[in-house]
C-alpha cells in the first residue's frame, strides 16, 4: 500500500511552517530541502514515500519556501538552525536522523555542532559548509549582490527551455530525468513574487568577500554523531573533492558517492538514495 503523506502547519518562533509527515517506525527521519526555489515536496516526495515504509519521515518547507511563511528579517544560517530545532521539538521526536540537502545540509551540520542532543545520525547531502570558500569565491560574492541575481528567478521562469537546460546542467547527470512535469513545477515556483529572495538574503548574509560568515568547515572535526555524506560525483555547486576532504575531517564518517549524479542525487535516483540511507540506519542498530 502506498505511503500517505500528510500535511501539517506548525508555528515556530512566530513563523507558520508547512510540514509533511509520513510513515511510522522506531526511527524518525527529518529531511531538509535545498535553496533557490526548492521545497520539501519538490526535493523529497519520492524518497519520502520509500523511507516512509520503514520510518517516520518529516519534511518541512523552510521559512520563505513552499507553503511556509516569509519573514521580514535576514535568512541566516543561524535563523534556519533555530527554526529546525523548533520543528524537531514541536514534533516531540528527538533524537532524529537528520538529512539535509545543499542549504539543508549546511543547516544539518550547524545543528550537529550546536544541538547534538537532537540528532542521532547525520546525513549531509551535497552540503553547504563542506568547504572554506566557494568555487570562484570573489566572483560569487560580487554576483550575489548584483541586480543579475535579484532578477534571475523571475526572468528564467519565463522560458521553459532555459529552465530545462538549467536543471540538466546544474542538478541532473541523467538528462532523461528532467521531465516536463518537473520543468513546469520549477517554473511555477520561479514565477512566484518572492521567488529566490530568501536564498539571496542567505547568500548575502553568509558569503563574505574572503570566506563564509559561518565557518562550518573548520569545525567538522567536532561532529560527534555517526555521519554519512552522500554526494553526486559530478556536482558542480559543491565539487566532490569537498566531500572527500570533509569525510576525512569528520571523525565517524562514511561517504557514499552517487556516480554520475550532480546536485540533486536524491531526485535523480531516489531508490538508490533511500537504500543507502536505510543501510546506514540499519548499520547503527536503530
Regions found by a protein language model. Name each.
Residues 113, 121-155:
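Flexible "cap/lid" loop of the alpha/beta hydrolase fold
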Residues 36-46:
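The serine-hydrolase catalytic nucleophile loop
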Residues 26, 34-38, 102:
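Active-site glycine-rich loops that stabilize anionic/oxyanionic intermediates
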Residues 156-219:
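Conserved alpha/beta-hydrolase catalytic His-Asp/Glu region
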Residues 20, 45, 49, 55, ...:
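Active-site loop/oxyanion-hole signature of alpha/beta-hydrolase fold enzymes
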Residues 253-286:
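Catalytic active-site module of serine/aspartate enzymes centered on a nucleophile-bearing elbow/loop
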Residues 1-31, 52-55, 93-94, 278-286:
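Alpha/beta-hydrolase fold catalytic core
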Residues 223, 229-231:
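Short beta-strand/loop motif that positions the catalytic acidic residue
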Amino acid at each position: 500500500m502506498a505511503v500517505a503523506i500528510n500535511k501539517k502547519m506548525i508555528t515556530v518562533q512566530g513563523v507558520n511552517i508547512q510540514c509533511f509527515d509520513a510513515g511510522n517506525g522506531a526511527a524518525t527521519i527529518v529531511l531538509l530541502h535545498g535553496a533557490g526555489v526548492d521545497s520539501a515536496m519538490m526535493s523529497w516526495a519520492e524518497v519520502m514515500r520509500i523511507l516512509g515504509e520503514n520510518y517516520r519521515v518529516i519534511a518541512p518547507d523552510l521559512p520563505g519556501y513552499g507553503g511556509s511563511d516569509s519573514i521580514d528579517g535576514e535568512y541566516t544560517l543561524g535563523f534556519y538552525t533555530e527554526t529546525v530545532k523548533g520543528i524537531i521539538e514541536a514534533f516531540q521526536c528527538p533524537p532524529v536522523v537528520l538529512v539535509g540537502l545543499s542549504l539543508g545540509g549546511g543547516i544539518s551540520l550547524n545543528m550537529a555542532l550546536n544541538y547534538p542532543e537532537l540528532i542521532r545520525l547525520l546525513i549531509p547531502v551535497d552540503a553547504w559548509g563542506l568547504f572554506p570558500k566557494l568555487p570562484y569565491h570573489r566572483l560569487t560574492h560580487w554576483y550575489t549582490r548584483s541586480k543579475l541575481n535579484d532578477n534571475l528567478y523571475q526572468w528564467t521562469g519565463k522560458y521553459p527551455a532555459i529552465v530545462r537546460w538549467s536543471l540538466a546542467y546544474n542538478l541532473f547527470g541523467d538528462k532523461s530525468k528532467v521531465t516536463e512535469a518537473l520543468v513546469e513545477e520549477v517554473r511555477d515556483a520561479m514565477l512566484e513574487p518572492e521567488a529566490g529572495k530568501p536564498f539571496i538574503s542567505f547568500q548575502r548574509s553568509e558569503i563574505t568577500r574572503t570566506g563564509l560568515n559561518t565557518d562550518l568547515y573548520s569545525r567538522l572535526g567536532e561532529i560527534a554523531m555517526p555521519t554519512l555524506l552522500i554526494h553526486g560525483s559530478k556536482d558542480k555547486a559543491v565539487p566532490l573533492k569537498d566531500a572527500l576532504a570533509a569525510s576525512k575531517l569528520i571523525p565517524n564518517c562514511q561517504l557514499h558517492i552517487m556516480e554520475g549524479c550532480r546536485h540533486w542525487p536524491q531526485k535523480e535516483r531516489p531508490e538508490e538514495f533511500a537504500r543507502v540511507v536505510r543501510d546506514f540506519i540499519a548499520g547503527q542498530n536503530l
